Design a protein with these regions (language model features):
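Short, solvent-exposed loop/linker segments at the N-terminal edge
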Residues: 92-98, 191-198, 284-290
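Flexible, low-complexity linkers/stalks enriched in Thr/Pro that connect modular domains
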Residues: 65-82, 172-185, 265-274
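Extracellular acidic loop/turn motifs
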Residues: 1-3, 108-115, 207-216, 299-301
Length: 301
């Protein structure tokens, strides 16, 4: 009897094989499925081969065939790497708490993220898997880690693969922990200064070992006095205008991590000269060589 038809089914499609007269074998070129086989049963695509002769007899070979079953399983591997997206902290962030929360997503839209391949390194320390919380999400995992870090700069490295062995592009995040406020020393004006000059120089020096440069703000009775230039050594000086009476001057310095220091000065501005309202001499006239009293009546605001 002659072979009437040879077909093979794969992923819902049926393909007709034709006989190669040179080899005597039945052949067909098939385009592999566009999706990985990892999420299929047994991580394989199942193929079913059917051979029919002229009499209508059919031989079927599938995954359960005792001799050829393994040949009916097709392993398809995708070639698109998973994607790592850092969430926090952001690149270049300044944090004012030594307890640092690290969070990132890893996703893959085909074979799926290999959970065990997700690794996190903080500076030179490889974080153990049991310290990383990995919560399944649509297409991957949201990963979280909380740890205590010393003040200073830090680097996070994140790596992952999918189930087909594709390696994600490593993500690196650098950030700074700074829990110490900047220093602030005010050289002028002196606390309690009383002056008849409207212009007053506010000067001092500031420094932050971790999060320089800092910003300095000056207010008088709550009114902002504008930009304060700071030198390379942290020194600053700004001429401000006082108002008549009591002036509460607040100088505040803040670093990039949001830590701040503040100094207050109270300065009184009085430009009104005292008034002489009366002069009395008793006795007048006075005998030569005798004592007399001078009394002056003055006022000042």
């Amino acid at each position: 009897m002659a072979i009437r038809r040879v077909t093979i089914s794969l992923n819902g499609q049926t393909y007709q094989l034709t006989k190669n007269t040179a080899t005597g074998k039945y052949e067909v070129d098939v385009t592999a499925p566009t999706e990985s086989s990892y999420n299929k049963e047994g991580h394989m695509y199942e193929m079913v081969l059917k051979v029919e002769d002229d009499a209508g007899n059919v031989t079927t070979v599938d995954r359960y065939h005792p001799l050829l079953g393994e040949n009916m399983l097709l392993d398809v591997e995708e070639r698109v790497a998973p994607v790592i997206v850092p969430i926090q902290p952001g690149e270049g962030a300044y944090l004012n708490n030594q307890t640092v929360q690290i969070q990132f997503d890893v996703t893959d839209n085909d074979s799926g993220v290999d959970r065990d391949s997700i690794t996190l390194q903080v500076d030179s320390r490889e974080i153990p898997d049991y310290e990383i919380t990995k919560v399944a999400t649509s297409g991957g995992y949201r990963c979280s880690y909380s740890g205590n870090l010393q003040d200073g700069g830090h680097t996070v490295e994140i790596n992952a693969r999918d189930h087909d062995g594709n390696t994600a592009i490593q993500k690196t995040v650098t950030f700074t922990v700074d829990t110490v406020p900047p220093t602030l020393d005010i050289s002028t004006p002196a606390q309690g200064l009383v002056t008849n000059q409207r212009d007053c120089t506010v000067a001092g020096k500031t420094n932050d070992a971790t999060s320089s440069p800092v910003t300095v703000t000056i207010t008088i009775n709550g009114a902002d006095q504008g930009t304060v230039p700071i030198g390379g050594d942290g020194s600053f000086a700004k001429i401000v205008s006082l108002v008549g009476g009591t002036n509460t001057i607040r100088i505040k310095v803040m670093d990039k991590a949001g830590k701040s220091s503040e100094v207050s000065r109270t300065v009184t501005y009085n430009s009104t000269a005292p008034e002489v309202e009366g002069v009395e001499i008793t006795p007048n006239p006075v005998d030569a060589g005798k004592i007399f009293k001078i009394m002056v009546d003055v006022t000042d605001e």
